[in-house]
Swiss-Prot record:
EC number: 6.1.1.19
Motif range ('HIGH' region): 127-137
CDD domains: ArgRS_core
Keyword set includes Ligase: yes
Molecular function GO terms recorded: arginine-tRNA ligase activity; ATP binding
Keywords for this protein: Aminoacyl-tRNA synthetase, ATP-binding, Cytoplasm, Ligase, Nucleotide-binding, Protein biosynthesis
Protein name as catalogued: Arginine--tRNA ligase
Upper classification of the organism: Bacteria, Pseudomonadati, Spirochaetota, Spirochaetia, Spirochaetales
Catalytic activity entry: tRNA(Arg) + L-arginine + ATP = L-arginyl-tRNA(Arg) + AMP + diphosphate
Length: 585
């Protein structure tokens, strides 16, 4: 609704400004129309800045304003205030159209075509197979999952990819510790998920290496060499431990409702990049150093086209082995061939900014793809109150343990409310997932997070459980209304004259714009904070207003339709944020 009104107003304003410019023989390259909310609701529903037009057209603000008002006509109420023209909507029509649109489109409300036909790949999670997922992975996962849903809601064809890092020294460290200290233990014997068991041996390796540094390093290199040469026993151990780890990680994905369209294993595709570099050498796009290593020059400044200040980047070592960047080049080629993407987004922590800047430059230079098609969506670190997490020291919040701890805390609270309630465990899990996902999404993704369990689980304030609770409360209101079996042929929306109702309607009507902005900025926190804004406004309205009034059924019907629209919009937000909707709390 609001999008349509803005488009209509922009067309009319543009027409007016063009006519005024033409009459004054002024050439216009572009007409920039600034629309914003007035600081106070009584001033209007939309403000248009006229001042810039006055400077360009050399006309007074009142003259320009009057011409715009003529063009707008009687469709909206208008009032000039200083450099602004304030617009008031036709409330009755606006309310009716908004509520009807939401309750008709239901789960599709908010969907738009701003990214129609755009093919997007999002690579996220990408865990190592030497440890379980921790809360940092959870932030990566929920950013990737939520952004995928937001981009889909804007019309993009999204493919979600997970590249599991199942080779290299990190898994060899767990393998070495298992060989030394494992005694053929299995996840079944240990009664542990496989990823947790492998993580234990990763910690054991670091304990061993701290006392035997040089020996441990030599043993790791020997083990890695044996794997690369295909030594049967080494490959068998590698296969077994990786399967345990990956099976455990997939269990966590299942719990958190994180899904992928395609899962790659690094061990299956890491050689592709070598061909890209060899071809680049043949075409003169990179060069061979005296020691045999193949290199490329990276400008130290983005705009340093002459390459007079550069640093040398090795793409293939002198012994022919590749580095991570070279493997990533191969991955881009494979995905371009398979999906022919328009853009590929990497959801990776901010500590990898330099790596991706280099990767994108090299991909462009070697003709793999235009670097503008590659995006590093970097996010801030997730820290504990006691400091940064270190998996090698065991100082991490495991994802599974965090979910379990929050579920247990929630269970204690739920048992106070529902002594005989069935399925409390499932309810507690869904509340905990809502708490975690919302807490990790509500902050702008580039910022670091200090994870606070208590705050994340709060049933009041800016939290996932609060959003879930408001949704459950509205559902309870609708159940109560339905049980009254009240006949309602035609809703009279003219009765919704409460200022709180008007504010809620305006928030609901802006949902599509929020999705478009979240898509454009690649920022799920926009949707998270929108959902809190809507939930908070409805909660205030509910406290001050009698929604079901048997003495005024006509008003009751109108307010129930409003409540339905609010609930549908909240549910749509929850879907975009991967927060479970709960009917009863």
């Amino acid at each position: 609704m609001i999008k349509t009104i803005k488009a209509d107003l922009k067309n009319k304003i543009q027409k007016t400004i063009k006519e005024l410019a033409l009459s004054s023989n002024i050439k216009l390259d572009k007409i920039n129309i600034v629309m914003q909310k007035p600081p106070k609701s009584e001033m209007g529903d939309l403000s248009i800045l006229i001042f810039e037009f006055s400077k360009i057209l050399k006309l007074s603000i009142p003259v320009i304003t009057q011409e715009i008002i003529k063009q707008i006509g009687n469709e909206y109420k208008t009032k000039s205030m200083g450099p602004y023209l304030n617009i008031k909507f036709n409330r009755k029509e606006y309310i009716q159209n908004t509520i009807k649109k939401v309750n008709k489109e239901k789960e599709n409300y908010g969907a738009n075509n701003s990214l129609q036909n755009k093919k997007t790949i999002i690579e996220f999670s990408s865990p190592n197979t030497n440890k379980p997922l921790h809360v940092g992975h959870l932030r990566n996962d929920i950013i990737g999952e939520s952004l995928s849903r937001i981009l889909k809601a804007s019309g993009s064809k999204v493919t979600k990819i997970n590249l599991i890092n199942d080779r290299g020294t990190h898994i060899c460290k767990s393998m070495l510790a298992y060989k030394k200290f494992g005694n053929n233990i299995t996840p079944e014997i240990a009664q542990k998920k496989g990823d947790h068991l492998i993580g234990d041996f990763y910690v054991k390796y670091n304990e061993y290496a701290s006392q035997n540094s040089e020996i441990a390093e030599n043993e790791i290199q020997q083990l890695l060499c044996q794997w690369e040469q295909g030594d049967e026993k080494t490959v068998q151990l590698w296969t077994k431990l990786n399967k345990w780890a990956i099976d455990g990680i997939k269990e966590t994905y299942n719990t958190t409702n994180i899904t992928f369209d395609k899962i790659y294993l690094e061990s299956e595709i890491f050689k592709i990049g070598r061909e890209v570099v060899i071809n680049g050498l043949k075409e003169g796009l990179c060069y061979k150093r005296e020691d045999g290593a193949i290199c490329i020059n990276i400008p130290t400044e983005k705009n340093n086209i002459d390459n007079q200040n550069f640093k040398q980047k090795v793409l293939l070592r002198a012994n022919g082995t590749s580095i991570y960047l070279t493997q990533d080049l191969g991955n881009i080629v494979a995905r371009k061939n398979e999906f022919d993407f328009d853009e590929m987004i990497y959801v990776v922590g901010s500590e990898q900014i330099h790596h991706f800047k280099t990767l994108f430059y090299v991909a462009d230079k070697l003709g793999v793809t235009n670097e503008n098609n590659l995006i590093h969506l970097s996010y801030g670190m997730v820290n504990l109150p006691e400091g940064k997490m270190k998996s090698r020291e065991g100082n991490i919040i495991d994802a599974d343990n965090l979910i379990h701890d929050l579920s247990q805390s929630t269970m204690l609270e739920l048992k106070k409310r529902y002594e005989n309630e069935q399925n409390l465990q499932k309810l507690a899990l869904n509340i905990s997932l809502g708490a975690i996902h919302y807490y990790l999404l509500k902050t702008a993704i580039h910022k670091d997070i200090l994870f606070n369990k208590t705050e994340s689980l709060s049933f009041t304030g800016n939290s996932g459980p609060y959003i879930q609770y408001v949704g459950a409360r509205i559902n309870s209101i609708l159940d109560k209304y339905n049980n009254l079996n009240l006949a309602n042929k035609n809703t009279n929306f003219d009765l919704l004259v409460n200022e709180n109702e008007w504010e809620i309607i305006k928030i609901i009507s802006e949902f599509e714009e929020y999705i478009i902005k979240a898509s454009k900025d690649r920022n799920p926190s926009i949707i998270a904070n929108y959902s809190y804004l809507l939930a908070k406004n409805f909660s205030t309205y509910y406290q001050d207003t009698k929604i079901i009034d048997k003495d005024n059924l006509e008003l009751t019907h109108a307010r129930i339709d409003l409540a339905k629209a609010v609930l549908q919009t909240i549910k749509n937000c929850m879907h975009l944020l991967n927060i479970p909707y709960i009917q009863k709390m």
